[in-house]
Amino acid sequence: MIILNIVEMIVLFIFILLSVAYLTVAERKTLGYMQRRVGPNIVGYYGQLMAIADALKLLLKEIIIVRESDKILIIISPIIALCFALLSWAVIPFSPGIAIGDMNYSLLYILVIGSIGVFGTLLVGWSSNSKFTLLASIRSTAQLISYELILTTNIIICILLNNTLNLNSFIDNQQTIWLILPLLPIGIIHYIARIAETSRPPFDNVEAESELVSGHMTELSASPFVLFYLQEYNNIVIMCFLNIILFFGGYLFWLPFIDNGSNLINFIINYFNINNFNFIYIIEIIFYVINISFKSIILTYGFIWVRASFPRLRYDLLVNLCWVIFLPLLFSLLILIPHILYIFDSFNIYN
């Protein structure tokens, strides 16, 4: 049983790393088409092997470390950041009953694990012995802490409506209506905060490409740089999956003629005259995984479209957006929504 769990984790992490790698290719191709150019198109068919070529190039390069820096911490920091980013996948449900760890406090687990990853950013900034990386890591940490407060407040509001911390229960409660419909403003704020939390454009204030400053990764090269890069794109994917689970019904379909996928799955089973129970279960899993993945791909492409469309915000505007606009608005909603639920005696709107 232990060996089977280890194999499941390894297979899941391999698929995650492959999806993260090809997200970089999708981003470069999308940005190319939006800027009226082709993008990567040499390595493989239409540039589909560009991710493998980039990975090999960066992994085979020499690791150059600043002489006066703490060499051990520079190597450990990206490993810490990537490992804690990957650990968040342990509680993500891809279909009914398909998750490495289905715990009752899975949402709290994701919040805690996601907060620990910021230590990698702090450590690499402090250990690089460079003012650029130190200042960038401090600014990045301040930004992450600020917008984690926004995300946590959003999630508390969702918990008030669902009365649970279990992600599978979140999905089951949305069989009748997705949470994005009653909480549309909170869903929009949540998505904006997700972009800021991952330090993506237009919130990438720690970077300055024209001055060759890449935030806390300025002094990194080769494999440490790759690990931080993987951590950034992994955070994009995991946050899109979490957004889908919280607001868009997770792996559930929500169309009258599909009826959460059961009618479509039954049609396929009857059409091909499938009687094997295990095979039917596999078909259901495939449909649910495709559904949640398709929803997440749409939100992930939203990150790319925002990057190509909007200019970078000034740092003071970024901070004011969090502390002056979003936070007072969410705190007022956090006070208002429990009162409304108490008045109508419906602290769990789905029961």
UniProtKB/Swiss-Prot annotation:
It catalyses: a ubiquinone + NADH + 5 H(+)(in) = a ubiquinol + NAD(+) + 4 H(+)(out). One of its GO terms (biological process) is aerobic respiration. It is found in: Mitochondrion inner membrane. The keyword Metal-binding does not apply. The chain crosses the membrane at residues 1-21, 46-66, 72-92, 106-126, 141-161, 176-196, 238-258, 279-299, 324-344. PROSITE patterns: COMPLEX1_ND1_1, COMPLEX1_ND1_2. Its EC number is 7.1.1.2. GO terms for molecular function: NADH dehydrogenase (ubiquinone) activity. It is a multi-pass membrane protein. GO terms for cellular component: mitochondrial inner membrane. Its main location: mitochondrion. Core subunit of the mitochondrial membrane respiratory chain NADH dehydrogenase (Complex I) that is believed to belong to the minimal assembly required for catalysis. Complex I functions in the transfer of electrons from NADH to the respiratory chain. The immediate electron acceptor for the enzyme is believed to be ubiquinone. Belongs to the complex I subunit 1 family. This is NADH-ubiquinone oxidoreductase chain 1. It comes from Wickerhamomyces canadensis (Yeast). The gene is ND1.
